[in-house]
Amino acid sequence: MVRVIAHRGASAAAPENTVEAFRLAHELGADWVELDARRTADGKVIVHHDAELADGRTIVELERVELPDHVCDLTDALDACEGMSINIEIKNWPADPDFDETESVARAVVGLVQERSLHDRVLISCFHYPTIQLVRELDPAIRTAFLHILIDRSWEELAADVAADGHTALHPWDGLVDEALMAAASAHGLEVNVWTVDDPDRMAQLVALGVHGLCTNVPDVARHVLDAS
């Protein structure tokens, strides 16, 4: 069954990456929520897509109490996702101001998954491949996925490498998805969850190609497409 993954929650109808957006995603038929994890200056793991706030301040330079009220802790986000699975994207790109070679966010997220026994409900993804490699080292029972918008090798080579390292899925940008990608993923036992898809016709095309998940800002639209297919 193809899963509906609410991108930053039901982000077309509520402020993204907020408790409100996560709860609404469930009401609109999402199976999963995708959210973004970053850290504050005092080491708290919070949910926010960009490294900076809307006012330009950098999150990693601020303590938790300095953040706006709508920015939630990861713990609160997990509570708000009751009844759904969660794709936690760890934000740790080398070009970002909060890049951390020690992978403190990954370590904290793994600890939280273990503390709450969330292995069956959580998948961790990242654009930075060493991050998901570390997650696998820390806890091989946690599912992991490689996010990508560009590739530097063939789909066959990429899928073979990702599968050999024990990861669960590929998370490609929609514009990359074609039959060659799907064939390579299938050959190596990888799932494919696609981001970010809001057009119902494109959703139907991707379902026909055999994707496993649609990451979307409009989970109600995706649910309608899947129910009609």
Q: What function would you assign to each model-found segment?
A:
Residues 13, 69-72, 217:
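Residue-level signal for the nucleotide or nucleotide-sugar donor/cofactor binding architecture
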Residues 18, 70, 74, 106:
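Aromatic/hydrophobic pocket-lining residues that form the small-molecule binding cavity
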Residues 4, 31, 37-84, 90-93, ...:
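An active-site metal/cofactor-coordinating segment within enzyme catalytic domains
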Residues 75-76, 81-86, 90-229:
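Short loop-to-alpha-helix "cap/lid" segments that border enzyme active sites
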Residues 16-19, 65, 75, 220:
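Residues in well-ordered alpha-helical elements
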Residues 2-49, 112, 121:
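Conserved N-terminal beta1-alpha1 strand-loop-helix module at the mouth
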